A protein has these predicted regions:
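Residue-level signal for short, function-critical loop segments
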Residues: 39, 194-196
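Loop/turn elements at helix/coil->beta-strand transitions in domains of secreted/extracellular proteins
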Residues: 30-31, 56-57, 83-86, 182-189, ...
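Membrane-embedded segments
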Residues: 36, 40-117
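Short hydrophobic beta-strand that contains or immediately precedes a catalytic carboxylate
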Residues: 33-37, 239
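N-terminal secretory targeting modules
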Residues: 1-32
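Acidic-and-aromatic substrate-binding clefts and catalytic sites of carbohydrate-active enzymes
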Residues: 65-69, 166-168, 196-202
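Secreted/periplasmic serine-hydrolase-like ester/acetyl group-modifying domain
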Residues: 100-186
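Catalytic His-Asp segment of secreted/periplasmic serine-dependent ester chemistry enzymes
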Residues: 204-239
Length: 239
C-alpha cells in the first residue's frame, strides 16, 4: 500500500519527505551509490554527471539540515530495495547538536515514521485518486547557478591543536550506520565537501581520528581545493 500511494503521489511529496518517497519508487537494485547528508551533499554531488562520465547510478538522499537519525532511517529505507556498493556520508551533519531533549524526540519521530510510514505521508492520502503534476527529478541533486563568492581567509583549514567533538548521540547513530552498511555489503565513505562556511581543521581532525579508529575511508576535499581547481569567486555560494 505504501508503494502504491507514494508511486501515485511522488510528484506531490515535497520538503523533508521527498527523498523517502523518491527512493520508494526507484526500480529495485538499480543504484550503485547512495549519498546522504545535509545540503552539502545534494548541492555537491552531481548524479547526472556521475552517470554521464562514469556510468554510475546514484541517488542523493540528502535533506536540508539533515539530522543523523534521519540519515540512518533514510539509508535503512533505501536498503529495502537497493544494493549500493558505496554509501557516501557528507560529514557536516555529524556536528549538528540539537540537544538531549530534541535528539530524543527526533529519534522517536524517525523510528515511528519508518515503522509506520502512514505518519510520514498522512497529508497526502486524501489525494490518492488525483493525477498530480510530476516534477523533474535529478535523483536528489539540486541544480543551482547562483554565485555568492567566499571572500574570507583562504587558510580556513589552518591546523589547530584541538578537535571539535561530535555529539554523543551522533556517534551512536554513526556506528549504527556503519553496521547497516556492513550488513548490506556496502562500503561507507566519509566525505567533507569544500565549505569554508561549515568546515575547519578542528572538525577535520575529529573525523580523521574517528575514521582512523574505525578503519573507515575519509576524504576531506577541503584539503584538495587547489587540486580540484575550485574558484571561490565563481564556483560557490559560501559567503
Amino acid at each position: 500500500m505504501e508503494y502504491y500511494v507514494v508511486h501515485q503521489l511522488n510528484g506531490e511529496v515535497t520538503g523533508r519527505n521527498r527523498p523517502f518517497a523518491a527512493l520508494t519508487v526507484e526500480p529495485e537494485d538499480t543504484l550503485d551509490l547512495l549519498v546522504a547528508g545535509d545540503s552539502e551533499s545534494y548541492n555537491s554531488v552531481s548524479t547526472m554527471r556521475l552517470w554521464d562520465d562514469k556510468g554510475i547510478t546514484t541517488y542523493d538522499c540528502g535533506q536540508g539540515a539533515q539530522r543523523i537519525p534521519e540519515t540512518y532511517y533514510m539509508l535503512k529505507h533505501a536498503f529495502k530495495k537497493q544494493s549500493p556498493k558505496i554509501v557516501i556520508l557528507e560529514t557536516n551533519t555529524l556536528f549538528r547538536d540539537i540537544g538531549a531533549v530534541k535528539s530524543t524526540q527526533e529519534i522517536l519521530t524517525q523510528a515511528g515514521q519508518y515503522y509506520l510510514p502512514v505518519f510520514r505521508y498522512h497529508n497526502l492520502w486524501k489525494t490518492v485518486v488525483d493525477e498530480p503534476e510530476m516534477h523533474t527529478n535529478y535523483k536528489g541533486f539540486v541544480i543551482r547557478d547562483e554565485v555568492d563568492p567566499y571572500e574570507g581567509k583562504p587558510d580556513y583549514m589552518k591546523k589547530k591543536k584541538k578537535c571539535e567533538t561530535m555529539p554523543e548521540y551522533v556517534k551512536v547513530y554513526l556506528e549504527k550506520i556503519e553496521e547497516l552498511c556492513e550488513k548490506n555489503n556496502a562500503q561507507l565513505l566519509l566525505v567533507s565537501m569544500p565549505s569554508p562556511k561549515n568546515w575547519n581543521h578542528k572538525r577535520h581532525a575529529e573525523i580523521q581520528k574517528y575514521a582512523d579508529g574505525k578503519g573507515i575511508t575519509y576524504l576531506d576535499l577541503n584539503k584538495k581545493v587547489e587540486e580540484l581547481g575550485l574558484n571561490w569567486t565563481e564556483d560557490t555560494q559560501d559567503k
